Amino acid sequence: MTPPSWLRVARLSELADDVPLSLDADGTPLVAVRHAGTVSVFEGLCPHQGSLLADGQVVAGQLVCPGHGWRFDCASGRRAGDPATCLHRFDTHIADDALYIDVDELRAFHARRAAHAPTARPLASLPGPDGLPLFGNLFQLRETRQHLILEQWADTFGPLYRLQLGPYRVMVVADPAVVQDAFKRRPDTFRRLGRFAAIAREVGADGVFTAEGDDWRRQRKVTTQALGHGQLKHFFPALMRITGRLRGRWERAADAGHEVDLLDDLTRFTIDVTSAFAFGEDLNTIDGHAGTLSRQLNEVPKALSRRAIAMLPYWRLFRLPADRALDEAREGLTATLARLTDDARRQIAEDPGLAARPVNYLQGLVAQQLAGEHAFSDENVSGNVMTLMLAGEETTARALAWLIYYMCEKPGLQAQLRGESDAVLGESGLLHDFADHPRMVLIEAAAHEAMRLKPPAPIHRLEALHDTTLGGIELPKGALAFLLTRHATTREQAGDGADADAFDL
């Protein structure tokens, strides 16, 4: 019989040798590891910067953090090279197929963490811009400039300030350490806005991006396995084929002296790449082959953007032409994804080896579904395929467009990047060996610098799931936290003399 002081955290059969397993105990992230016949349960966040240790790997008897490579002994939890830094290792109890930890020890762990936390202040004590009665600051935030307005207010009121958006109390965070703290406390303390998740479900993009809690953990495990390094390597020839198509389009335009719409072409490029990777369909929108499927896919991001900024969810009361177009597109996409899912299931049945080497993301999801380790429905499959399509199109296209913009502004940088690409790519202008991509060091650095200045998501909006504190400020359940990810990186640091708002390698 198991004593009442023990809390069940996992089934032992879920724990494979040398594969970290993500656990949750009353909202506390943990990680379980089985190595050399010994099962250990540790605190789940790396003490360095809070990375989720379950996303790491076991190498030579050490649990390696996915963030910055800190290594912890699988038996003791001590950090390699710094034994003073040690993960908390919980006492465990195993009965039949169940793995337990001591509830009293978990409470003591919480108490020690709480004892080191500073005394919190109420949200109302923060400064903030004046607003209107009832509406607060709602009408001061124009959607197209929202991140710029919030950053300007951070310059005025400091890295932590408050807003009132109608009935919602908002804490705006521009302090990088506090932003990071909020991120690492997802999904148990903070979630994405419930309103956005509901809209994503309505447009058919209900996947890991909108999932929360245990559902997020379940879907994340499956989707990360379906996005493994092997799948990316297998997809590489298709990526180069589509890249060559874009290159050819631009070469023809240059020879004819025609201008190109850079963002439109890059959006077509990312649509072709993402659809080929997601479900194996090369839509070839670069050459203008706008078939039914590409038109249907185009309706989803438009509807998501339109509904995300709407003041009221009017579409739940009546339908406008754009909403009817979405309904028609969703019906077609649902049928297409159901057919592709059935095809993937049949292909794996005919060639079981595809389960270990799927040729696209959808096939990888179906392989994980058939393995049966995690409950994963056909709706989960289609929702995560649509999530990948949304995540891979417009944001990637804009990031590439900004990189090219900065490159064109700086002829010296352009010459450097061209020199590196010529050295790596040769006369063909395309990368032929997947193993060569790490040699493009300057190009990768330039991409990171462009995303520092122009990140695809300069604001992350979270909602408190229960009463909590953030940055020493009390946040009641339902309060919102707007995280500004760009602000600190574009402001000059005292005394360094650098222009932080300028592109600089």
Task: Pin down the residues of each PLM region.
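N-terminal pre-ligand scaffold of iron-sulfur
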Residues: M1-A60, R78, H88-A115
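N-terminal membrane-proximal hinge/A-helix region immediately C-terminal to the signal-anchor transmembrane segment
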Residues: H116-A205, F209-R218, P237-G248, F269, ...
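Conserved cytochrome P450 catalytic core segment spanning the I/J/K helices
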Residues: P133, F139, G228, A329-A399, ...
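Conserved cytochrome P450 K-helix E-x-x-R motif and the immediately C-terminal K′/meander segment
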Residues: L138-G158, A335, R339, L430-G471
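Cytochrome P450
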Residues: Q164-M171, G230-R241, E251-A276, N284-T292, ...
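Cytochrome P450 fold signature focused on the C-terminal beta-domain
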Residues: A344-P358, R418-M440, L453-I473, A498-D501
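Cytochrome P450 catalytic-core helices
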Residues: T395-E420
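Conserved cytochrome P450 K-helix/beta-meander segment immediately N-terminal to the heme-binding cysteine loop
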Residues: L483-L505
